[in-house]
Swiss-Prot record:
PANTHER family: UREASE ACCESSORY PROTEIN F. One of its GO terms (molecular function) is nickel cation binding. It comes from Gloeothece citriformis (strain PCC 7424) (Cyanothece sp. (strain PCC 7424)). This is Urease accessory protein UreF. It is found in: Cytoplasm. Keywords: Chaperone, Cytoplasm, Nickel insertion. UreD, UreF and UreG form a complex that acts as a GTP-hydrolysis-dependent molecular chaperone, activating the urease apoprotein by helping to assemble the nickel containing metallocenter of UreC. The UreE protein probably delivers the nickel. It comes from the Bacteria.
Length: 232
């Protein structure tokens, strides 16, 4: 593996790019249902939706599990990675979200195995195939970040960036915003990404929580929509 000064920077761009095929582009995280129900129809509505997800869900569950999985991977402690996966699965109460977390995680793992050579990735591939680990997307992303030579901070920020850009892409496809508006929102949310990451570093696995009731209901109602562009 190339351990030059540029390699981690290039890996950071690769992992956070929407071009990286992790399957997350198929997810709207409730945005589609809220848009069809006319609960989100403006730029301000979308910004609030993203901020709620960042501060009340992503930064208090997914990102927390990712950080602990990264630390476990860094010290070659796969039991810690498995525990983070188990705890995050238990915190993910909506069945469809569990299913999509597995699918996108395994899609990411498949791409990573073809891209990087690493014994942890090999072990995780075997364990997800056996069903002994869920292989949720944030957990796999954590290990891939470590394998790619990223720091804990860069891995966490790459995860947040890819999550937000994925949702902004969904908002464009749902005709809520245009491309220029998406870029403005992404820039505006930069302080939220930083705050979300910093807070997540201070949360233990057994302290994870989420509080997004309206979004949760929208995600559960998604399967009842007459037409759907997204998987959730």
């Amino acid at each position: 593996m190339n351990h030059s000064l540029l390699a981690p920077k290039l890996a950071l761009m690769q992992l956070s790019d929407s071009f990286f095929p992790s399957g997350s582009f198929t997810l709207s995280h409730g945005l589609e249902a809220l848009a069809q129900g006319e609960q989100i129809h403006s730029i301000k509505d979308l910004e609030i939706f993203l901020q709620i997800l960042l501060h009340n869900k992503l930064g208090t569950t997914d990102l927390v599990a990712l950080i602990h999985a990264y630390r476990g991977s860094k010290r070659e402690d796969l039991d810690a990675v498995r525990e983070a996966d188990h705890q995050l699965f238990a915190q993910t109460l909506i069945e469809k979200n569990r299913e999509m977390g597995r699918k996108s995680g395994r899609a990411l793992l498949m791409v990573a195995r073809e891209t990087w050579q690493d014994t942890q990735l090999e072990t995780l591939e075997k364990e997800t195939a056996k069903g002994t680990i869920n292989g949720l997307h944030p957990i796999i992303f954590a290990v891939v970040g470590r394998v790619a030579g990223l720091s804990e901070t860069d891995t966490g920020l790459a995860f947040l960036h890819s999550f937000i850009t994925g949702l902004l892409g969904a908002a464009i496809r749902l005709n809520i915003i245009g491309h220029l508006q998406a870029q403005k929102i992404l820039l505006k949310l930069a302080p939220d990404l930083e705050t979300t990451y910093q807070k997540a570093t201070e949360i233990n696995l057994n302290e994870m929580f989420s509080c997004t009731p309206l979004i949760d209901i929208a995600q559960m109602n998604h399967q009842n929509l007459d037409y759907r562009l997204f998987a959730n």
